[in-house]
Amino acid sequence: MRLFSSAFAHIFPKKAAFHLFGAAIIIVFLGVGGCRPERFVANADLELRCETDTVLFDTLLVGAGSITKRFKIYNDEGRNILIDEVYLAGRIQSGGSAYRININGIPANALTEVELRARDSLYIFVEVTIDPNQQNTPFLVTDSVVFRSGNRTKAVQLVAYGQNAVFFNEEVLDCNMVWDNTLPIVVYNSVLVDSGCTLTIREGTRVYFNKNSSLFVEGTLRIEGTPAQPVRMRGDRLDPLYRDLAGGWNGIHLLRGSTGHRIENLDLRNGTIGIRVDSLPADADSVNVIINKTRIHNCAVVGLLAYTARIDAYNMLVSNCGLYNFLGDYGGRYRFRHCTFVHLNSGFQRGYPVFGLSNRDYNNSPSPTHLELENSLVWGSRSNELVLDSSGSGTITTLLSYSIIQSETQRPGVQLRYTNPKFKNPSDNDFSIDTLSPAFQRGFDLRGLYGGRLQTDLIDQARAPSPTLGALERIE
């Protein structure tokens, strides 16, 4: 003890030590006095302030949970208050509520004696999952969160719309199945059209795909949309945060050996690879895929990907995809008439051109490659948006005519290079042509050819004798 005392004597004189000891005693007593519990007062005249009077969810597919939404309740009083009860009104209904709430971090559909400090706030988190019923059209699902103090109550309304659907989950589809627009189609974990079978998708059909889901086709795919009622394919997250997010689902995959595909009036968005074509027909002169009046937009990797395929496309718009809008690899034959391939004003960091084509050898065999591009637009923010890779041993032949191409290389038949086609509003994904566009009335009249497919444009407007280049006709 003497050692301890002597060790500190030179640091703290006796008088100073006494004062420090006294100060410590005072602090202890102050601390004890400050440990009184906070008081929370129940008040029948309490007036809570709500951040909103309604929480609105977008239309939800039945069985699919919503995103979590939140709102706040404020205590504007200068004292702590006690809320008698916070509860979900529909909890006592038969079958319960479609909604779930979390009260300031506590998952519960009802809490009593909820404390709220002076000039503080309370978080309420809300989710909803809607059960199916017999309705074909969207239906309303409501509830409310109620706050009760004494005789006073305040309620925040919860509003969502449910949409029934037909669900498929990791299955081989019935042979020669037809999907129609009676109810939306929802695909979980992918589906397969078997060899020798055909899937027909009628006009106006909406198809929603869960994350990482694909439509695989070993047989034949027939998409029969119309300009007024296109077939729509999307991811199944419909809320604003996710509905325009690229990579929300995989895409259509036309497998090797499949053939006879016809795609009319399809609006496909937000996939990973929009349409992938692996098919190599036995007859080298046949066509795997015919595409007409189709839009492919905002795919995370490639809009249209083809391996040694044969594709004819008319009035097709492929826009703002992550790596390529179109990529043809290991050769193939590709004929595009009145098509637009464009990448502008997207959130992607781009390191690849809009349009790529390669004759790479496959299994040490040459891959002949043929490209026809007529009355078309290939445009983007890079200096060279059309790249032909001739590293393979197969021949490459091209027929490029009456087209505007953003390219460093002058290719035979290209009408204009480095000439901005002046899209009307690309920031809003409007790739129609502005009034003073050099693409206006610069095309060759193809209306009498190719089965009349080019008499009208992507949105069914009549084409002029001197047509606008690209998928969309400029109407004066």
What spans do the regions from the language model cover?
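Surface-exposed binding patches on compact interaction domains or structured appendages
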Residues: 36-56, 76-127, 132
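Predominantly extracellular beta-rich ligand-binding scaffolds that present long acidic/polar faces
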Residues: 279, 306, 311-432, 459
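Extracellular beta-helix/beta-solenoid repeat scaffolds
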Residues: 182-244, 260, 315-340, 344-347, ...
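Right-handed parallel beta-helix
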Residues: 245, 259-319
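Surface beta-loop-beta hairpin patches that serve as ligand-binding interfaces in beta-rich domains
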Residues: 434-476
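Buried hydrophobic-core signal for structured, non-transmembrane domains
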Residues: 68-75, 126, 140-149, 266, ...
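Terminal connector regions
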Residues: 131-164
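C-terminal motif of bacterial Sec signal peptides marking the signal peptidase cleavage site
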Residues: 30-34
